[in-house]
C-alpha cells in the first residue's frame, strides 16, 4: 500500500446563535462551494454580499490558491450567513498560519479585526428562556391591587 502525501487542509467552524458552518480549506484553484453549490449562486443577493465580505476585504488573490467547501445547518438565513462568513475568515487565517507564513497570517487577521471583530470571534449572545409569570423572558403579567 503506497502512502500518499497529506494534503494541506484545515477545518474551521463559525457559529451564530444555533447556526453552525464548517469550512474545509485546502490547496486548490480558488473554488468556494456552499453546501455543494458555487457561492456565487447563493440567494438572496443582499445576504450574498455579506458572505463575500471577507473575500472582498482580503482580495481574491489570497483565495486564489485555496479551495473551500462549506457545510451549514441550523438557525435562520441571516444567522447562517454570519456563521458562513466567520468560518471562511477563520479557515483562511488557520490555513495561512499552518501552511504559508506567520507574517501574512497576522496581516490578514489585522484587516479582518479592523473591519469587523465578529469575522473571527463568535458572538456569545443566546436567546434567554421564558419564565413563568409572564409572556416572555423578562416581561411580567399585569398586577392588580384591587
From Swiss-Prot:
Keywords: Ribonucleoprotein, Ribosomal protein. GO terms for molecular function: mRNA binding; structural constituent of ribosome. It holds the Pfam family Ribosomal_S9. The keyword Ribonucleoprotein applies. One of its GO terms (biological process) is translation. GO terms for cellular component: chloroplast; cytosolic ribosome; cytosolic small ribosomal subunit; mitochondrion; plant-type cell wall; plasmodesma. InterPro entries: Ribosomal_Su5_D2-typ_SF (IPR020568), Ribosomal_uS9 (IPR000754), Ribosomal_uS9_CS (IPR020574), Ribsml_uS5_D2-typ_fold_subgr (IPR014721). The keyword Ligase does not apply. Belongs to the universal ribosomal protein uS9 family. PANTHER family: RIBOSOMAL PROTEIN S16, RIBOSOMAL PROTEIN S9. This is Small ribosomal subunit protein uS9z. It comes from Arabidopsis thaliana (Mouse-ear cress). The gene is RPS16A.
